[in-house]
């Protein structure tokens, strides 16, 4: 059995921890763990900053970042608007009025992934909008909400977030919360 000095053991533990964190530093889970544990009780009003280039959203209270999230913004042809906005509506159980499915009276999906403006409604069916939970509308028809994250811009212009992050941003924001969307 090899006996090490206590100082050497601590040094080795520190090296292993450092190497592990360096290997994970690009993982969003590390960033999520670090920022999700920051107190949300910092005084000051919340604000939201979205970086389309980084595909990240940040929640601030004053100058303190209290949360961050991976996102999926608008794909080609459905770009997310850039500029300074503010939350104009909150809807915890929002559904899209444009995108969704045509469903028959028994609840069976007749036609999926439709644009209600362009796709003809099959007989004996009705439109059911795609769920967009924790919707924070910042410009007419555009908002942050829970949705699928394929790792690239893929939405119709909204900003999709994981469930737990969309909920965190939703609970922190209020009508009038500033939203800055940067290229």
Spans of model-derived segments:
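Post-signal peptide N-terminal segment of mature Sec-exported envelope proteins
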Residues: 33-63
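Bacterial Sec-type N-terminal signal peptides, specifically the leucine/valine-rich hydrophobic h-region
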Residues: 21-24
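Bacterial N-terminal signal peptides that target proteins for export
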Residues: 4-15
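Exported/periplasmic cell-wall-interacting domains
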Residues: 82, 101-183
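Short Gly/aromatic-enriched secondary-structure transition segments
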Residues: 65-76, 101-107
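Solvent-exposed coil/turn segments that connect beta secondary-structure elements
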Residues: 53-55, 62-65, 74-76, 90-93, ...
